Regions:
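Short Lys/Arg-enriched alpha/beta "domain-start" segment
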Residues: 1-55, 156-166
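Contiguous alpha-helical scaffold segments within structured protein domains
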Residues: 2-9, 92, 102, 106-125, ...
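Short, solvent-exposed loop/turn elements at beta->coil junctions and helix N-caps
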Residues: 8, 186-189, 330-335
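An anion-binding catalytic pocket shared by soluble metabolic enzymes
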Residues: 22, 32-45, 74, 159-240, ...
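Non-catalytic accessory segments adjacent to catalytic cores
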Residues: 44-159, 164-165, 258, 391, ...
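A short glycine-rich, hydrophobically flanked beta-strand micro-motif that places a catalytic Asp/Glu
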Residues: 61, 150, 182-185, 324-332
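A residue-level signal for conserved active-site and pocket-lining positions in enzyme catalytic cores
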Residues: 61, 87, 145, 200, ...
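Conserved hydrophobic core element of enzyme catalytic domains
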Residues: 281, 285-397
Length: 397
């Protein structure tokens, strides 16, 4: 028997729910970019490495970026699950579904928020040759008749003196505006993303996606911020990089959708540290296709892989130092009525609580006229959202 319950949202509900995230081995958290909708999945009824094998009222999960395998990980190579307990917060109301728990308030009140213990953080890994490898890539792009763009990833790793609570990380993410806040946890493994980029949303057959490519930092003053934004809107390199993504989305959605609408010019999408070129795309989904079909079709966009796709992915697999796992991959949820939403796992971090390490991810779109030093600075900027989550701890670099 499935239990359903709903009521008005109380002031302390979210605190109890955040505390609950630290008490289950398998959980998911999905918060929309406007902060109005928050979805929680606790425990597991069914799980799989492929979403095609799961049919439930709601399924959470994520694909791996590609077919490279991360050794000893049961999360980063792709993971999907139907939660045993589902909670949604939306429009000032809280909704609960479970096959196991009949009294929601009694269940919720057992989870008490506790303070994060002091943690010392020490950087243990940095790709010191990244700029050199990026210069090699730029040289190849200038001498290769086929390869046009490669999104080149970069990683940093930190040793943690103790476990970091998921509840604490989500609280810290609240300062990251205009971004989705997404977490997947499987036992001692946690993937967390504060991503500005939606891959696709489907509701009642209506599809929304967007091209997000081309980045510059926020200004320190209103005038400087506007100046940077104008520079980005008029940057030949960034506009070309952005158009790769727009064209790719248009081509991939043809045949799967009708009423496909793609604006001719991008606008600016601004979040705490960065501003991006942004083109929203809408369409109606053909009934023959599920949201999972569309996710598989769209991934990876040129904002995550490159152009042409096959050659760019081959370069990434050969020249990036470590597999990406869930980094830059689709993460989200879908429902039994073929609705759902997926984001791409950028501005992200992987925490392994078994060995207390945190791996941060960033990437930059490299084209023939890129500058390796500038791209290094851009990736350093893209580490900031996750570095911000670790801010306040003691660093021992």
């Amino acid at each position: 028997m499935k239990y359903h319950f709903s009521r008005g949202l109380r002031d302390d509900d979210k605190q109890h729910l955040l505390a609950a995230l630290d008490c289950f081995d398998i959980v998911a958290y999905f918060e929309t970019s406007n902060g109005k909708k928050k979805l929680f999945g606790f425990g597991v009824k069914e799980q799989s490495q492929s979403p095609k094998e799961l049919k439930g009222d709601i399924v959470f999960g994520g694909y791996a970026f590609d077919d490279q395998v991360i050794a000893n990980s049961k999360l980063m190579n792709g993971f999907w699950f139907i939660p045993s307990i589902f909670v949604a917060i939306n429009d000032g109301k809280i909704r609960f579904e479970s096959d196991e728990i009949s009294d929601f308030d009694q269940w919720l009140m057992q989870f008490l928020f506790s303070k994060q213990k002091a943690v010392t953080i020490r950087r243990t890994f940095e790709e010191k040759d990244w700029q050199s490898r990026t210069r090699n890539l730029i040289n190849k792009l200038n001498n290769d008749a086929i390869l046009e763009k490669v999104v080149f990833g970069r990683q940093q790793q930190y040793a943690l003196s103790a476990k970091i609570k998921m509840s604490y990380l989500i609280q810290k993410m609240a300062s990251q505006d205009n971004t989705y806040h997404v977490i997947l946890k499987r036992h001692d493994e946690i993937f967390i993303s504060a991503t500005p980029e939606r891959l696709v949303k489907v509701t009642g057959g209506n599809l929304k996606t967007a091209a997000v490519a081309g980045t510059i930092r926020r200004g320190k003053t209103v005038y400087e911020d506007k100046e940077f934004g104008e520079y980005l809107l008029n940057s030949v390199k960034n506009k070309r990089e952005h158009q790769y993504v727009v064209n790719n989305i248009f081509q991939k959605l043809q045949g799967m959708t009708t009423n496909l609408n793609v604006p001719k010019q991008p606008i600016l999408l601004k979040n705490k540290q960065m501003q991006h070129l942004y083109t929203p795309v809408t369409a109606d989904v053909n009934t023959a296709y599920s949201i999972v079909d569309i996710v598989q079709r769209l991934h990876p966009t040129p904002a995550l892989g490159g152009v042409p796709q096959i050659q760019a992915l081959e370069y990434i697999q050969t020249h990036e130092q470590s597999p990406r796992g869930l980094f830059a991959a689709p993460i989200g949820y879908y429902t039994a009525d073929n609705s759902g939403e997926f984001v791409v796992g950028i501005r992200s971090m992987y925490i392994n609580q078994m060995v207390n390490t945190a791996t941060l991810f960033a990437g930059a779109g490299i084209v023939s006229d890129s500058d390796a030093t500038q791209e290094f600075q851009e990736t350093s900027l893209k580490f900031k959202p996750m570095r911000q989550l670790l801010k306040g701890y003691t660093y021992d670099d």
